[in-house]
Amino acid sequence: MIRQIIVVEGKNDTKRLKSFFDVETIETHGMGLGKETIEVVRRANEKRGVILFLDPDAPGEKIRKRLNDAIPGLLNAFVMKEDARTKKKVGIEHASKEVLEEALSHLVSYEEDRQSLSKEEFYELGLEGMEDSAKKRETIARHFHLGKCNAKTLYRRMNLMDISYEEAKEVL
């Protein structure tokens, strides 16, 4: 059994996770994330801990940011978009058991005010402003289980996870 309560976007995500794992979930019902739901997540985090396991798309990232900003100490699980999609849809409910297990075994907790990587080092690694920057960002994101990110989000997540220039350079 997974001790923490997992926050997902909808009932199909809950069904998918429960088909493989003994878990309890809180559903945000998509972008309709109200104060009441945030308070439920806050209380759940105080009692048992919470894992945010949201879809690898723009709405999922907005919900993740809003919850992480409102509630310190949440754990985050990420899947890459290509690992959680059908021809027309993207979501946790489309990921395989192996992908879900992998994501849940690499949880990320955000701690603000860290800077293990300067903006200059980020550029020096070629993670922004180069022809192959998107490919390099994907390599880093996949290796450190950060989910698909644009440059700004990757920079923030790398610092929040305390990933150094040396660690990133080794991966690239």
Question: What do these predicted regions represent?
Answer:
Residues 4-16, 20, 28-37:
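N-terminal, positively charged regions that mediate nucleic acid binding
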Residues 19-23, 31-172:
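TOPRIM fold recognition
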Residues 1-5, 48-51:
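Short active-site oxyanion
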